From Swiss-Prot:
This is Chaperone protein DnaJ. Its cofactor is Zn(2+). Participates actively in the response to hyperosmotic and heat shock by preventing the aggregation of stress-denatured proteins and by disaggregating proteins, also in an autonomous, DnaK-independent fashion. Unfolded proteins bind initially to DnaJ; upon interaction with the DnaJ-bound protein, DnaK hydrolyzes its bound ATP, resulting in the formation of a stable complex. GrpE releases ADP from DnaK; ATP binding to DnaK triggers the release of the substrate protein, thus completing the reaction cycle. GO terms for molecular function: ATP binding; heat shock protein binding; unfolded protein binding; zinc ion binding. Residues 4-68 form the J domain. PROSITE patterns: DNAJ_1, DNAJ_2, ZF_CR.
Amino acid sequence: MSQDYYQVLGVSKTASQADIKKAYLKLAKQYHPDTTNANDAEKKFKEINAAYDVLKDEQKRAAYDRFGHDAFQSQQARGGGNNGSFHPDINDIFGDFFSDFMGSGRRKQTSSKIRGSDLKYDLTIKLEEAFHGIEKNISFSSEVKCDTCHGTGSEKGETITTCDACGGVGATRIQQGFFTLEQTCHKCQGNGQIIKNPCKKCHGMGRYHKQRNLSINIPAGVENGTRIRHTGEGEAGIRGGNNGDLYVDIAIKPHDIYKVDGANLHCKLPISFVHAALGGEIEVPVIEGGKVKLTIPAGTQNGDQLRLRSKGMSKVRSTIRGDMLTHIHVEVPKNLSKKQRELLEEFKKESINEKENDSSFFNKMKSMWS
């Protein structure tokens, strides 16, 4: 079974792209075959690259968050993915790393845009809703883009100027002996821009707090614990930054009749001892609604399991369904009428005579006492 990509890189499912890249660079340096002789280095390096290849791409990541490794099975079957023996050059991997942390000899103008935070929402649904799929309306509060300044943070018609203290870089440099240190610009607070007349509604942030309503589509066959990612539905970014994402975690309520086992459903089916002995048909409820007939074989024993094929849960992106397994519970009556007792006494006599006439049974009993 493939390991979870987030676990491979050691990051959370809400990690930012910067966190994912940082974790990848650290692990790639540790396990690159050119830098270590560890026996499992090549295998680990392949896993790290496969995980990063998916998580660095927003579309691939969204598909992985929703469907897991199944989203890429067809690609792997065609030979896709980074499963060969090719190793990216160690210098290529860390080229950006060293330019980011050591400096490239010239200063780049930084952007004041900040990505919005991701949000998490816990949604509980019924088993029937998980089977059929459903559209749910959810309500939550978050930071939204200011509709007065359109996210600029400035009053309408006012201009935003480049910070004259740092030249729009967002940081100033201090020379200390042989070393040059950078610190956040005290004038623009690292934004690189100065808003002379901030928007009164959002106080210059380009966003404000608001209660939101959103329609969430739950696919048929969703499982308990599934996380659905809605790209761009998290908190609004600051000063034009990208929105964060919304993660909806699905929990399915325990059902009164069914227990879920993957795509299969289990239920306890009580039947009379007459049905168990003689057999017959009995109607049982099914998850899609209504009832179907189940054949009870004559001589069914307590604890027997009878299967109704394709009457279990639906599966995401599939027409195949699981099965429903009924666990037989034979009920013995506690109170009998006079006629019922007489009939059972007669049945008892017949049963004893049958056993005595059964030579194999009689011989077994005789051998025990001889």
